[in-house]
Amino acid sequence: MFVVKMVLGFLILLSPLCATGLDISQTDIIERSLNFLLFVGILWYFLAKRLRSFLHSKSLEISKRLEEIQAQLKVSKEHKKKLLKELEQAKEKAELIISDANKEAYTITQKYELQTKMDVENLIKNSKALMDLEVKKIKRELVESVFKDLRESKKVSFNAQDCVNILKQRL
């Protein structure tokens, strides 16, 4: 089949030379052409199977390599998707941690503000109580010193009932 196509192709190429009217009787172009076609046919006969098997094996190698590359690409894409999913989860976890930390910081701040307020109120109450005690103590000492001075002085005389009445009215 292939040889027939070659012969027809060769004849089509030589047809313009035949139409020109040149005298090619003195040349051996036809014999050489037939020898060439025979050589190509014999070469094709012996090498066709090897050439086909070589091309087929190369085609199989290429398709096998293509399948391997596609499998690697698929694995890479799956790995990328997995990593992107893990990244999203990590971002969500980080946002959750930050929000929890902010809530906890607010709670701790409120707790310490309340504790500080209570401590200040207690300090104020304690200082007022201490001031009241000191005032009472100073009044008592003053009254005692005045009564002591009055008793020691002979100008005024008090009995116990008068002292009790004065103390009740002043304290």
Swiss-Prot record:
An example molecular function term from Gene Ontology annotations: proton-transporting ATP synthase activity, rotational mechanism
Domain of life: Bacteria
TM region positions: 2-22
Membrane topology recorded in Swiss-Prot or TrEMBL: Single-pass membrane protein
Disulfide bonds: none
Keywords: ATP synthesis, Cell inner membrane, Cell membrane, CF(0), Hydrogen ion transport, Ion transport, Membrane, Transmembrane, Transmembrane helix, Transport
Keyword Transmembrane helix in annotation: yes
CDD domains reported in the protein's UniProt record: ATP-synt_Fo_b
Assigned GO CC terms: plasma membrane; proton-transporting ATP synthase complex
InterPro entries on file: ATP_synth_B-like_membr_sf (IPR028987), ATP_synth_b/b'su_bac/chlpt (IPR002146)
Subcellular location: Cell inner membrane
Major location (coarse): membrane
Pfam families: ATP-synt_B
Physiological role: F(1)F(0) ATP synthase produces ATP from ADP in the presence of a proton or sodium gradient. F-type ATPases consist of two structural domains, F(1) containing the extramembraneous catalytic core and F(0) containing the membrane proton channel, linked together by a central stalk and a peripheral stalk. During catalysis, ATP synthesis in the catalytic domain of F(1) is coupled via a rotary mechanism of the central stalk subunits to proton translocation. Component of the F(0) channel, it forms part of the peripheral stalk, linking F(1) to F(0).
Record note on quaternary structure: F-type ATPases have 2 components, F(1) - the catalytic core - and F(0) - the membrane proton channel. F(1) has five subunits: alpha(3), beta(3), gamma(1), delta(1), epsilon(1). F(0) has three main subunits: a(1), b(2) and c(10-14). The alpha and beta chains form an alternating ring which encloses part of the gamma chain. F(1) is attached to F(0) by a central stalk formed by the gamma and epsilon chains, while a peripheral stalk is formed by the delta and b chains.
Family: Belongs to the ATPase B chain family.
Protein name: ATP synthase subunit b
